[in-house]
Design a protein with these regions (language model features):
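A glycine- and small-aliphatic-rich helix-loop capping segment at beta-alpha/alpha-beta transitions
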Residues: 35-40, 150-164, 214-217, 237-250, ...
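Flexible, low-complexity linker/loop segments at domain and module junctions
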Residues: 2-22, 123-135, 328-334, 365, ...
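Acyl-CoA/ACP chain-elongation machinery
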Residues: 53, 219-265, 298-312, 342-349, ...
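Condensing-enzyme catalytic core mediating Claisen C-C bond formation in acyl metabolism
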Residues: 19-23, 50, 251-328, 336-337
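Glycine-/small-residue-rich "gating" segment that lines the acyl/pantetheine channel
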Residues: 161-168, 209, 213, 230-286, ...
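ACP-dependent fatty acid/polyketide chain-elongation machinery
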Residues: 2-84, 106, 282-292, 389-404
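Active-site-proximal alpha-helical scaffold in enzymes
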Residues: 95-108, 177-180, 185-188, 194-229, ...
Length: 441
């Protein structure tokens, strides 16, 4: 458009920043599905890591033989079966279930599509459709590391043995990264913005930042956001194994994830989804929604250092933290709780501790810091969403969950990691930190 003094004034009025709150949470994790079960496991430090195996694969070739899978998961326990559901990979199944939980928690009501009625079918193509809400004012942005690797590996093996006859026409469409948001949008008749974000283990957090911006700029009233991942497959698990990024404490799985502990030797891979409902403040108030908290700041940076290792000085990660605090307009001493990336790898925990001391100075020693990954394992692209839920529940309950398995202090990791026991403390402002391969923060 042509820029004039009048147009500048008009656009300034039109583009005022809207406030963004969280009105629903849906955790699907190895330690609990739904916010109540998840929270109970968090505050009690209850993990569910165990030895794993892959069909027709010799496990002795894997250095790490433990993980945190979600046992007994069945999508039909959450939503009605449909033609769509039978083609979904495990990642999308987690995302659909978590979305259902989050929307239900947010008080969003849905009607189920009656596919027997032709006129109804033409109006509503999804399995469910929202009542009393404009589907074009609801969007979905989700983070994912590697979508539907279970399907990809399955069809790759069939291709090697049977050629093209072994490949389903549904194989390729369901392994696009964007298919995860397409599946969620189709299931719940969400017709606003829909796309996936893939920035390794920061994917869920980056998706939430993009959803925040979408609402803040007036794009939608409500966003389904967070992340999902299901990486416990022979190839993906093997890829991390050859990187020597995972713990080899195979005989003691529940002690293997030990962020900031001197005996840590790598992360434990988990799987699942953490979905949140972001909503414009006035929209949430008008419908009487429960508000968990408000998103007040964010920061994103790149290390520009290494494909897998974090920059040892942590400066770029620290810049992202500083940017989020500056945007929020809050002082260092106002942060009451930090949920760190806290992976249980030798380098990450050391760099993250150094960064927090650099950003917060002496105040860093007075802030409770607890790693959700000590309990859930590392949920990869889902981690940011699940850990944001941890922060919101800490704010709501006034309790910081523990970092479990913290037994041997590391002189280079000397902050308050809320060791082994939950702690009651009022939380007004919480900070969630994510980082990923490629130096994405």
């Amino acid at each position: 458009m042509k820029i004039t003094e009048q147009s500048i004034k008009e656009m300034s009025v039109r583009n005022y920043h809207k406030r963004v709150v969280i009105t629903g949470v849906g955790p699907v994790t190895p330690v609990g599905i739904g916010k109540d079960a998840y929270w109970e496991s968090l505050i009690n430090g209850k993990s569910s890591m165990r030895q794993i195996s892959f069909p027709n694969k010799e496990m002795s070739q894997y250095r790490c033989q433990i993980g945190a899978p979600i046992d007994g998961f069945d999508l039909s326990h959450f939503v009605e079966k449909s033609k769509l559901s039978k083609h979904l990979g495990r990642t999308s199944q987690f995302a659909v279930a978590a979305t259902w939980l989050a929307l239900k928690d947010a008080g969003i009501e849905f009607n189920m599509n009656d596919f027997e009625k032709e006129e109804f079918h033409h109006k509503h193509t999804g399995v469910y459709h929202p009542k009393n809400l404009d589907p074009y004012q609801i969007g979905v942005i989700l983070g994912v590391g590697v979508e539907a690797m279970d399907l990809m590996e399955h069809f790759h093996e069939r291709f090697l043995s049977r050629g093209l006859r072994g490949i389903s026409p549904f194989a390729l469409p369901n392994i696009y990264l964007s298919s995860i948001t397409s599946h969620v949008a189709q299931y719940f008749s969400i017709r606003g913005t829909s796309y996936a974000v893939s920035t390794a283990c920061a994917s869920g957090t980056h998706a939430m930042i993009n959803s925040f911006l979408q609402i803040q700029g007036g794009g939608e009233d409500l966003m389904v956001t967070g992340g999902a991942d299901a990486c416990i497959t022979p190839y993906v698990f093997g890829g991390f194994d050859v990187l020597r990024a995972m713990s080899v404490r195979n005989n003691d799985p529940n002690k293997a994830s030990r962020p900031f502990d001197q005996e840590r030797d790598g992360f434990v891979m988990g799987e699942g989804s953490g979905v949140l409902v972001f909503e414009e403040l006035d929209h949430a108030r008008k419908r009487g929604a429960h508000i968990y908290g408000e998103v007040v700041g964010w920061g994103m940076t790149a290390d520009a250092y290494h494909l897998t290792d974090p920059d040892p000085n942590g400066k770029s990660l620290g810049k992202a933290v500083k940017d989020s605090l500056e945007m929020a307009g809050i002082h260092l001493e106002e942060i009451d709780y930090i949920n760190p990336h806290g992976t249980s790898t030798l380098l990450n925990d050391r760099v993250e501790t150094r960064m927090l001391k650099d950003v917060f100075g002496k105040q860093a020693y007075h802030i409770p810091i607890s790693s959700t990954k000590s309990i859930t394992g590392h949920l990869m692209g889902a981690a940011g969403g699940v850990e944001a839920i941890s922060v919101l529940l800490a704010i709501e309950k006034g309790i910081s969950h523990p970092t479990i398995n913290y037994e041997f202090p590391d002189p280079e990791c000397d902050l308050d990691y809320v060791p082994n026991q939950a702690r009651r403390k009022e939380v007004r402002f919480g900070l969630s930190i994510s980082a990923g391969f490629g130096g994405v923060n």
